[in-house]
């Protein structure tokens, strides 16, 4: 469904922006098995879109290039978010038709499902006229998944713990970027299992960062600790980084547990040209030129 069509057909719409891990440091592991992370996160202008409309009975419909992959999944995060919020608000939660325009690859390291869940919480709160306390929303979001609280914010941030400790980063600038994914699945549990070390150095960012060049230097000196084991599972990840570098990317890195990689470029024109070249070489991959949001939004 085109963007204009979604806005016309549904009274409330929400963007589910792609989540980009500019840095992901694995710094430890809790007794319950969850890994401790320190992440610098931003969000892209591209992503999924959702529409919400009052209905006689609950309905869920799909469109978009990756929508068919979710068909028949009655336990996806959108429906879980709807049901969880309904339990919280009770009788005020009338039946709703939710439409998901699935533009992002499934399980690709850029928070698609988590962003959809967060957008569902935001959209249904608007549709149902709800205004829940921040701590209640944070608890609901974390119940849905470790990435959902940061996707609910959808702005540049540092996340720690398992992702629930969030600190805004108002000085992070916008970046011209290319996202690329070979459309091969990566098992997140297997990536963590293959980690060579689980107590890696913490993420350190100077408090005085302001210029874009300073941020690029800081991001360049950071890392994604999940990238080496993910490359063992999907060698195309390393290939993507090499191809982005060949197109002039200033920084390349994998996002999340993969397999999406990003390249930061000096201008949006350079990013668009690189995306076109990459798509020409690998038309079977997901390739998207985009711009990330700034901390000032």
Swiss-Prot record:
Reaction catalysed by this enzyme: 4-CDP-2-C-methyl-D-erythritol + ATP = 4-CDP-2-C-methyl-D-erythritol 2-phosphate + ADP + H(+)
SUPFAM superfamilies found in the cross-reference section: GHMP Kinase, C-terminal domain (SSF55060), Ribosomal protein S5 domain 2-like (SSF54211)
EC number of this enzyme: 2.7.1.148
The entry's keywords: ATP-binding, Isoprene biosynthesis, Kinase, Nucleotide-binding, Transferase
Active site: 19, 147
Functional pathway: Isoprenoid biosynthesis; isopentenyl diphosphate biosynthesis via DXP pathway; isopentenyl diphosphate from 1-deoxy-D-xylulose 5-phosphate: step 3/6
Residues that, per the record, bind ATP: 105-115
GO MF: 4-(cytidine 5'-diphospho)-2-C-methyl-D-erythritol kinase activity; ATP binding
InterPro entries per record: GHMP_kinase_C_dom, GHMP_kinase_C_sf, GHMP_kinase_N_dom, IspE, Ribosomal_Su5_D2-typ_SF, Ribsml_uS5_D2-typ_fold_subgr
Listed GO biological process terms: isopentenyl diphosphate biosynthetic process, methylerythritol 4-phosphate pathway; terpenoid biosynthetic process
Record-linked NCBIfam families: ispE (TIGR00154), PRK14608.1 (NF011202)
Family: Belongs to the GHMP kinase family. IspE subfamily.
Main function: Catalyzes the phosphorylation of the position 2 hydroxy group of 4-diphosphocytidyl-2C-methyl-D-erythritol.
Protein name: 4-diphosphocytidyl-2-C-methyl-D-erythritol kinase
């Amino acid at each position: 469904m085109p963007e204009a069509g979604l806005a016309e057909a549904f009274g409330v719409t929400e963007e589910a922006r792609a989540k980009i891990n500019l840095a992901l440091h694995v710094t430890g592991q809790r007794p319950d098995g969850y890994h401790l992370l320190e992440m610098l996160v931003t969000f892209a202008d591209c992503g999924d879109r959702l529409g919400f409309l009052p209905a006689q009975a609950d309905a869920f419909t799909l469109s978009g290039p990756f929508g068919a992959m979710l068909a028949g999944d009655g336990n996806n995060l959108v429906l879980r978010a709807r049901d969880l919020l309904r339990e919280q608000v009770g009788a005020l939660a009338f039946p709703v038709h939710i439409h998901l325009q699935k533009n992002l690859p499934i399980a690709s390291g850029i928070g698609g499902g988590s962003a959809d869940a967060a957008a569902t919480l935001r959209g249904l709160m608007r549709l149902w006229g709800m205004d829940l306390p921040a701590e209640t929303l944070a608890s609901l979001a974390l119940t849905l998944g470790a990435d959902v609280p940061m996707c609910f914010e959808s702005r540049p941030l540092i996340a720690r713990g398992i992702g629930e400790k969030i600190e805004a980063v108002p000085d992070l600038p916008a970046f011209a970027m290319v996202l690329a994914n070979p459309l091969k699945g990566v098992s997140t549990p297997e990536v963590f299992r293959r980690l060579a070390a689980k107590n890696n150095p913490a993420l350190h960012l100077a408090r005085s960062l302001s210029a874009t060049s300073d941020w690029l230097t800081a991001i360049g000196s950071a890392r994604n600790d999940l990238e080496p084991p993910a490359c063992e599972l999907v060698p195309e990840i390393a290939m993507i980084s090499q191809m982005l570098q060949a197109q002039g990317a200033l920084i390349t890195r994998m996002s999340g547990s993969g397999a999406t990689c990003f390249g930061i470029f000096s201008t949006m024109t350079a990013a668009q040209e690189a995306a076109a070249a990459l798509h020409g070489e690998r038309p079977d991959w997901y390739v998207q030129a985009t711009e990330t949001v700034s901390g000032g939004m």
